[in-house]
Amino acid sequence: MGNVFANLFKGLFGKKEMRILMVGLDAAGKTTILYKLKLGEIVTTIPTIGFNVETVEYKNISFTVWDVGGQDKIRPLWRHYFQNTQGLIFVVDSNDRERIGEAREELMRMLAEDELRDAVLLIFANKQDLPNAMNAAEITDKLGLHSLRNRNWYIQATCATSGDGLYEGLDWLSNQLKNANR
């Protein structure tokens, strides 16, 4: 009987967990974002070959964030991380106008995958501190986000180095998780 109450208490007041897959083209800022959220500081990064995984605690939610390398040669490996993903963070370098079309192709390819059909989508429009950065509305248009049907999505302007916008993105993810559990 005590176990029933313990489980009920945990369900009401315990930590919720959310599995997040963070992807995007190479040099978009994924690893910088991960460690800014985890450590609160900027770390020196090198191109990710493989993945980094960290748990980020925020507002009584334990986010397990998988940061997977974005170089074109290793993008086919992304699909190995799709299973059980509840939230997808797609990081875009807002200053990289030349590759926004490539980013759109990769995003749409992923969203067509059956294993990600229930995952919510958060776009981090990163590097907003740079003078020629595209704003969130322009990125929304160039990624074709308004054409998405049956998918909860949100775009957040961010700057990984200062941390601007990162926690607002986690707020949106945590609200999606709470709404899904109702």
UniProtKB/Swiss-Prot annotation:
GTP binds at residues 24-32, 126-129, 160. Its EC number is 3.6.5.2. Disruption phenotype: Conditional RNAi-mediated knockdown in the eye results in aberrant compound eye morphogenesis. Maternal RNAi-mediated knockdown results in abnormal aggregation of Golgi apparatus and disrupted cleavage furrow ingression in early embryos. It catalyses: GTP + H2O = GDP + phosphate + H(+). GO terms for cellular component: apical part of cell; cleavage furrow; cytoplasm; cytosol; endosome; Golgi apparatus; Golgi membrane; Golgi stack. Keywords: Cytoplasm, ER-Golgi transport, Golgi apparatus, GTP-binding, Hydrolase, Lipoprotein, Membrane, Myristate, Nucleotide-binding, Protein transport, Transport. One of its GO terms (molecular function) is GTP binding. It comes from the Eukaryota. Belongs to the small GTPase superfamily. Arf family. This is ADP-ribosylation factor 1. It comes from Drosophila melanogaster. The gene is Arf1.
